[in-house]
């Protein structure tokens, strides 16, 4: 399954690792977070190596809708209640600075990536009260937010939260240029990490520090990320021709859609659900019906799925991997907001690795304890994991090599999925999504 980004951006191939090497920092993962972290570390004068199991940007970065925004759904009104006003303010500031940093980099290095400044909108066709609260919270926290009654969508809304000065781009075109001066080894899968040794299927690299930017951290102990994070799947339909929308849009109703343009194409998003729990309806069929109604002149040009890591309190894990591994670092749990979160993570981690502190360290710390924000999701995540593990003991079950949960078949995405932690496998058992690191035996 290919996306508009993988179809339109050509990133030069890099050679795999050969033999054993020594470096200051190893970054595991060649997506947006990993490449940006390596980029900033190199600017600090650090010798850094990036290891990518497939190709640069071939993971979730290649299947995003690529909105660069600090508007993360109805998050600020929630964070003010669960983690407090100051932590919510710092979360918003880190992401808004990330939005602005993309613009600075693209201008400074003359990166051709179809970058466009756009306002971002949260909309509802049912009510306006929760949008008013979100706009008030975001504005109170210093973000460029306001409540509006009208949008440029081809249907009437009850209201919307508008964030000005946000942006969109082609993420793989951006990665192509920003990674040009980095040492990246593609088609080099990390098998395990032991202290300061990163063992791959091509050789071993010894490093002073290790960064896990591989979407979902695959080392279970220490860290225990499998117990405090799960994955969600969503669906994207590419349509053409569609007149360019003025803005980027995300619905907040139970059955809502996202919209953004790319030239005369439109990316229509829909259908978020926990990976391994297939929806009752076919998301692509639903989107096709909506597209035929709203954009009758348009034809389908492509379709794909995205998969995102969700933390229990809604804030990414960025910082030291564990108290027991102070030289390991992690960037994960970006939710649906990988572009701004990747930049925020890169800035934070590059400072921490070079021995400096930032005002955002405590907010994003993987060792934080936001009990009020996490309790309900922890219970729900635990229940789903227990069910998956119990299913793995049944006769004839196809088990995930990560922790043994029973695999389920996603008939819409045509692949095997783990309902516990979100690993994915092609029909023949070949691994295509972590945290599992091995394929499963061939399935008839």
Where are these regions (language model features)?
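Flavin (FAD/FMN) cofactor-binding and adjacent substrate-gating region
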Residues: 2-8, 74-81, 103-174
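Helical element adjacent to the flavin cofactor pocket in flavoenzyme catalytic cores
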Residues: 137, 160-209, 213
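Rieske [2Fe-2S] iron-sulfur-binding domain
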Residues: 237, 393-444
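Glycine-rich FAD pyrophosphate-binding loop
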Residues: 43-63
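Extreme N-terminal leader/targeting segments of oxidoreductases
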Residues: 1-25
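Flavin-binding catalytic cores
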Residues: 242-245, 273-307
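C-terminal catalytic lobe of FAD-dependent flavoproteins
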Residues: 253-254, 284-285, 295-378, 396
């Amino acid at each position: 399954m290919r996306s508009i980004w993988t179809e339109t951006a050509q990133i030069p191939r890099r050679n795999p690792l050969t033999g054993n090497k020594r470096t200051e920092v190893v970054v595991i993962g060649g997506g947006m977070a990993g490449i940006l972290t390596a980029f900033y570390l190199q600017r600090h004068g650090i010798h850094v190596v990036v290891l990518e199991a497939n190709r640069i940007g071939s993971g979730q970065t290649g299947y995003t809708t690529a909105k660069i925004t600090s508007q993360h759904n109805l998050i600020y009104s929630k964070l003010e209640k669960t983690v407090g006003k100051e932590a919510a303010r710092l979360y918003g500031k880190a992401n808004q600075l990330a939005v602005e940093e993309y613009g600075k980099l693209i201008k400074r290095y003359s990166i051709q990536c179809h970058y466009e400044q756009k306002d971002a909108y949260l909309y509802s066709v049912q009510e306006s009260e929760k949008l008013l609260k979100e706009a008030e919270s975001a504005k109170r926290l210093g973000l460029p937010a306001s409540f509006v009654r009208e949008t440029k969508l081809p249907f009437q809304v009850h209201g919307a939260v508008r964030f000005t000065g946000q942006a969109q781009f082609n993420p793989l075109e951006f990665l192509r240029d920003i990674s040009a001066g980095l040492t990246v080894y593609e088609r080099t899968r990390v098998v395990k990490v032991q202290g300061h040794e990163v063992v791959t299927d091509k050789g071993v690299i010894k490093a002073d520090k290790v960064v896990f930017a591989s979407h979902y951290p695959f080392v279970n102990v220490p860290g225990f990320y499998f117990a405090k994070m799960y994955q969600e799947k969503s669906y994207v339909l590419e349509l053409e021709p569609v007149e360019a929308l003025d803005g980027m849009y995300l619905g907040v109703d139970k059955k809502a859609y996202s919209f953004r343009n790319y030239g005369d194409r439109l990316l229509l998003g829909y259908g978020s659900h926990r990976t391994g729990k297939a929806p009752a309806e076919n998301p692509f069929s639903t989107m096709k019906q909506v597209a035929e109604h709203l954009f009758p002149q348009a034809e389908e040009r492509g379709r794909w799925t995205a998969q995102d890591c969700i933390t229990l309190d809604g804030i990414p894990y960025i910082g030291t991997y564990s108290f027991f591994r102070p030289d390991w670092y992690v960037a994960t749990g970006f939710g649906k907001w990988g572009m701004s979160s990747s930049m925020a993570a890169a800035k934070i981690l590059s400072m921490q690795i070079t021995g400096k502190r930032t005002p955002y360290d405590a907010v994003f710390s993987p060792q934080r304890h936001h009990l009020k924000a996490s309790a309900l999701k922890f219970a729900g995540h635990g229940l789903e994991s227990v069910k998956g593990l119990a299913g793995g003991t049944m006769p004839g079950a196809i088990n995930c090599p990560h922790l043994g949960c029973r695999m389920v078949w996603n008939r819409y995405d045509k692949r095997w999925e783990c309902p516990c932690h979100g690993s994915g496998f092609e029909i023949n058992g070949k691994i295509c999504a972590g945290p599992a690191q091995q394929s499963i035996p061939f399935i008839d």
